[in-house]
Curated annotation (Swiss-Prot):
InterPro entries: Sid4-like (IPR021750)
Region entry Disordered, spans: 79-243, 368-396, 459-503
Domain of life: Eukaryota
Record's protein name: Septation initiation protein sid4
Pfam families hit by this protein: SID
Gene: sid4
Assembly and oligomerization: Homodimer. Interacts with cdc11, sad1, plo1 and dma1.
Keywords for the protein's UniProt record, in alphabetical order: Cell cycle, Cell division, Cytoplasm, Cytoskeleton, Mitosis
Compartments, record wording: Cytoplasm, Cytoskeleton, Microtubule organizing center, Spindle pole body
Function description: Required for activation of the spg1 GTPase signaling cascade which leads to the initiation of septation and the subsequent termination of mitosis. May act as a scaffold at the spindle pole body to which other components of the spg1 signaling cascade attach.
Basic and acidic residues composition bias: residue spans: 384-396
GO biological process: cell division; negative regulation of cytokinesis; negative regulation of septation initiation signaling; septation initiation signaling
GO MF annotation, one: signaling adaptor activity
């Protein structure tokens, strides 16, 4: 076994941190995504110089974040389609894209020599696409894939990917590290000129830059709020990783609202992968949203002083108008519900006060009965009584009871039939004890009725038995009287002795019959109890009787054996007696399985097994003797091997030939 796997163990270098599959061209170890012909591009070198300057101003933590982001979402673009369409108008140069100060990094220049080995086994190799990257403070780098009409058609027809609407935020490489929104760039096919749109986007970015205020806290943002579907990368089937966001607490995050001059794309505008929108980007606005945004802009101008007092209002107005409308509607509904709850609480308090006053004044002793039956309320005092308004409930004796919200007081002074009263704890305890007593009475009543039925049955049976006994006694008496002679009767009458009365005879017979029936019933009850106490026939074990062991019928009886008591302890039979029946049964099952003997024939075959064991012991002793005679040395202890027996047989044949 070790020799068979020795080669694989010796050539497996993965234990040393290096894989022997790295040299294979299909192992994904290449990080050069672009062709080498593009290295001489002057715009490319300018971008590399700009990236180097930006990287010099970053900290070690920011550089590690960028490296982790690139390692997690590496994607490339179809280079063949790019070569076939070099003059594609949808590809904008870096200087024309809004927010061009973002980092579009090349993995070859971003990663050093030390990080190449770490990236080999984490990233698959793609031979048809090129990707550029944007850094974010969320540690979630979304690729900005350059689109083409064929690529958009390919992604629109792909059934395995959701609509490619990325929600990632670009990171401004300023000292404060502010968060900005990348305004989505529409395609030229939608009727907007890229140059005009870029000019408008530059103007809007200048107008939207707001200086950071120290008093205003960063608003709470929810990533992917308007995209319920998960974000999937376009070239790989793996979803993007969402890491924690600890840096947002130490940075001033500013949200930019879209002004009225911002060109709204048409309703059928397809969202491509090149539109890098922030995690709280503005959705496509309708006419209602524009009206709400105008109202918000007016409210901003009117409530400038209020924002200095309450900093959270500014954060709410910076949110999208649809979200602001939802928040305002929720606030209005919450306020209305709170007002309704307050009014309902006041009504409940008034009703409870009136109810407690009436119950305490009119029937304080029957509180439990009135509360337990809310459908039959007590009578109220007439409205003309003066004590009705003056008296108040005693808080020490009666606790405040709460009534359900459906309880309404009618004008005629009566309760609503559907009203339900929450009973105080003391009254609940009393009711629970009363219920327990009632249940006990009910149980006793059932037992009493059952006993009465049994008594009636016994009476009926006793009456039937009395009738039968009376008839039999009558027949016996008549037969006896007929057998006697008339002379005896005459002598008895003449002597003046009176015959026993018939009623006395019947009473004696009835008592005897009752005693006999009671004895029969007692015997039946005893038999029933025995049947219940004795186990079922299926659970009773079958007892096997065998002949006792003696010195004559024991195995190897030709030898002088010890006494039965010594044999008992020599064989360890006391351990079997100490075991329970389950353990003994398991041992017997194991023996039957090892010997391959059914239980039905086990008593008859146990002698045969004994003889086979005895014969095997004799043959073993004979083999040991032959071995000593041939080789003049003792055989090793244990089972005799086939090879040893064959050698012994061969040696015996040789000796026989020599003797002949």
């Amino acid at each position: 076994m070790d020799e068979a796997f020795g080669d694989s163990l010796s050539t497996d270098y993965r234990w040393l941190g290096h894989s022997h599959f790295d040299s294979h061209p299909s192992a994904g170890d290449s990080i050069y995504f672009d062709s080498l012909d593009e290295d001489a591009d002057p715009s490319r070198t300018a971008r590399i110089d700009r990236i180097a300057e930006l990287l010099d101003g970053l900290n070690d933590e920011q550089i590690s974040e960028l490296v982790n982001g690139v390692n997690s979402t590496t994607i490339k673009e179809n280079t063949k389609k790019e070569i076939s369409n070099p003059n594609d108008s949808t590809r904008l140069p870096l200087e024309q894209i809004p927010g061009s100060n973002n980092l579009f990094l090349d993995p070859r220049h971003q990663l050093g020599d030390n990080s190449q080995n770490a990236q080999r086994h984490h990233e698959p190799s793609f031979n048809s696409e090129k990707a550029s990257y944007t850094s974010t403070p969320y540690k979630n780098v979304a690729p900005k894939v350059i689109d083409s009409p064929s690529a958009r058609h390919m992604h629109s027809n792909s059934p395995s990917f959701p609509p490619s609407q990325s929600h990632t935020s670009s990171y401004d490489q300023s000292p404060k590290g502010q968060l900005r929104d990348n305004i989505s760039v529409p395609n030229q096919q939608d009727g907007l000129d890229p140059e005009v749109f870029n000019q408008q986007s530059k103007e809007t970015k200048k107008s939207l830059q707001v200086p950071p205020s120290r008093n205003v806290p960063p608003p709470v943002t929810r990533p992917n709020q308007y995209n319920p579907e998960p974000n999937f990368s376009l070239s790989s089937g793996y979803p993007q990783q969402h890491f924690s966001q600890p840096e947002l607490q130490n940075r001033n995050v500013h949200l930019e609202t879209v002004p009225e001059s911002y060109p709204v794309p048409p309703s059928g505008y397809p969202l491509t992968s090149s539109t890098c929108v922030s995690s709280i980007s503005q959705p496509i606005q309708s006419t209602d949203c524009q009206k709400a945004q105008e109202n918000l802009s007016n409210n901003k101008q009117m409530s400038s002083n209020d924002q200095d007092i309450d900093p959270f209002k500014q954060a709410i107005t910076d949110l999208p108008p649809s979200f602001v409308n939802i928040v305002l509607e929720m606030n209005a509904t919450i306020q209305s519900l709170s007002n309704q709850c307050q009014q309902r609480d006041k009504q409940i308090e008034n009703i409870t006060k009136q109810l407690l006053m009436n119950q305490q004044d009119y029937c304080p002793t029957t509180m439990s009965t009135t509360v337990s039956t809310p459908l039959c309320p007590p009578k109220r005092f007439p409205k003309s009584t003066k004590d009705f308004k003056e008296q108040k409930p005693d808080t020490k004796q009666v606790r405040s009871a709460t009534i359900s919200n459906d309880f309404n007081l009618k004008g005629n002074g009566r309760y609503n039939e559907k009203s339900q009263i929450a009973v105080p704890s003391e009254i609940r305890v009393q009711l629970s004890t009363l219920d327990a007593i009632l249940l006990q009475f009910e149980h006793l009543r059932k037992e009493l009725t059952q006993a009465r039925k049994e008594i009636q049955i016994l009476r009926h049976t006793s009456q039937n038995g009395d009738q039968e006994s009376n008839e039999s006694s009558k027949n016996a008496i008549t037969t006896k009287t007929t057998d006697k002679g008339n002379n005896k009767e005459n002598t008895m009458l003449n002597d003046g002795s009176t015959a026993p009365a018939k009623n006395d005879i019947r009473n004696v017979i009835n008592t005897n019959n009752l005693d006999a029936k009671l004895s029969d019933e007692s015997e039946l009850m005893i038999e029933k109890n025995k049947s219940y106490s004795t186990p079922a026939s299926s659970t009773i074990p079958t007892f096997h009787t065998s002949q006792p062991l003696t010195s004559l019928n024991m195995p190897d009886s030709r030898f002088n054996l010890a006494k039965e008591k010594q044999l008992y302890y020599r064989l360890g039979l006391q351990h079997i007696d100490q075991q329970c029946s389950v353990e003994t049964a398991n041992m017997l099952k194991t023996v039957l399985v090892q010997l391959n003997i059914p239980f039905a024939i086990f008593p008859s075959t146990i002698g045969q097994v004994r003889r086979q064991l005895q014969q095997g012991r004799r043959l073993y002793q004979w083999a040991r003797n032959i071995h000593y005679l041939i080789y003049e040395e003792n055989m090793r202890d244990g089972l005799v091997s086939k090879q040893c027996l064959a050698d012994m047989l061969k040696k015996i044949r040789e000796l026989k030939k020599r003797s002949l």
